[in-house]
Amino acid sequence: MFPPTRVQASSRVVLKIFHFILVAFSLRSRRLSRLVLWLQFLGWLTWFISMWTQSVIYAQTIDCTLDCSLRHILTFFQTVSHAFIVVTSFLDGFRIKQDQLDEPIAFEDSDPWLAFTVLAMLVPTLGVEYLVCSNAPEYAFRIRIYHLKTLPSFLALQVQIISFILEVMKVNIRVRQTKLQLLILARELSCRWPQRKQKPQFSDQQAHRVKDLKRRYNDLHYLFVRINGYFGGSLLTIIIVHFAIFVSNSYWLFVDIRTRPWRIYAILLNLGFIFNVALQMAAACWHCQQSYNLGRQIGCLISKLVKPQGSKLYNDLVSEFSLQTLHQRFVVTAKDFFSLNLHLLSSMFAAVVTYLVILIQFMFAERSSTRGSG
């Protein structure tokens, strides 16, 4: 083994720190002792109960406007989603199964591209939170309380979807390696001398390689099944939360732009939230679309392995491999409710526009009723 380069060593440090962040937010608990699991769970449970209680009491003491209602909805969505992941992680820490997914982010990894992805996703998130904290005294009391309540859950959900993106990227690296091996085999079959191809030893050797590729493809499909099982529930809740954040901050951005004089920090803050959500959803859907496309490309390459003059065993293996790629697609889903791909992005954009128009209509209706009563 060669010693790691500086880039690999730095990447390993970044991924190791990211793993500790996952543990701190109770998003990973497989390697923790039971005492630590219980302490983490009770700590988060106390936080969630106290926050929900204060929100209910506060909501009953004031006359809630549309802006206030949106903040209560976002607080509920974000904290409930985080609580769901915490409970799932807590139960997963006591469950020992052979077929469960290992720690999704192994801090022994040193892939620079993974570390760069972590930094590219975390820096905008931390930048938005810096804007929130540095300008907190200028906000109204209800807005400061809203950001304080949602800060841990907001960061936890951001970190969780980043870990999901990294896991899909790691599997895609293996898929590309399998595709490369298949492409090499197809080129060898088309470039070797015809007399050598007629030998039984050559046919048996290629049949063994096809069988090995079939096994690799099956293992890759199983990795996607485990990703769906591990991240499916959290993905469903996170996508719902991200949709609500995108719609709400788009509405607040529209309100801030119409307000004179402009509040630059408020506009930048809403743009930051919108950018974070758009970046993470686009990255997740793009990498999942890449997984699906790579699987289809492997299926198309199998046609190049067909040998009319080959043995029956070889051609049967190629036919089975082709059927396997048709039935075992590399698809990532959120508990089978929907698949993550680029089509999901277009559907979400259309839904965002629809709900944004509805909120704007409610805003004008609320202001008209206020003026009428005044």
Swiss-Prot record:
What spans does the record annotate as topological domain Cytoplasmic, numbered to this chain?
Answer: 1-6, 58-72, 134-226, 285-343
Keywords from UniProt, A to Z, are:
Cell membrane, Membrane, Receptor, Transducer, Transmembrane, Transmembrane helix
- Residues crossing the lipid bilayer are 7-27, 37-57, 73-93, 113-133, 227-247, 264-284, 344-364
Q: In which compartments does the protein localize?
A: Cell membrane
What's one GO MF term for it?
ligand-gated monoatomic ion channel activity
Please give the tissue specificity annotation from the record for this chain. Expressed in the adult labellar chemosensory neurons and labral sense organ. Expressed in neurons of the dorsal pharyngeal sense organ of larvae.
Q: Which residues lie on this side of the membrane: Extracellular?
A: 28-36, 94-112, 248-263, 365-374
Please give one Pfam family short name. Answer: 7tm_7
Task: Give the record's membrane topology.
Answer: Multi-pass membrane protein
Choose any GO biological process term that the UniProt entry carries and state it: sensory perception of taste
Question: Which InterPro entries does this UniProt record tie to the protein?
Answer: 7TM_chemorcpt (IPR013604)
Which Gene Ontology cellular component terms are annotated?
A: axon; dendrite; membrane; neuronal cell body; plasma membrane
Role played? Probable gustatory receptor which mediates acceptance or avoidance behavior, depending on its substrates.
- Report the sequence similarity comment from the record: Belongs to the insect chemoreceptor superfamily. Gustatory receptor (GR) family. Gr2a subfamily.
Q: What is this protein called?
A: Gustatory receptor 23a
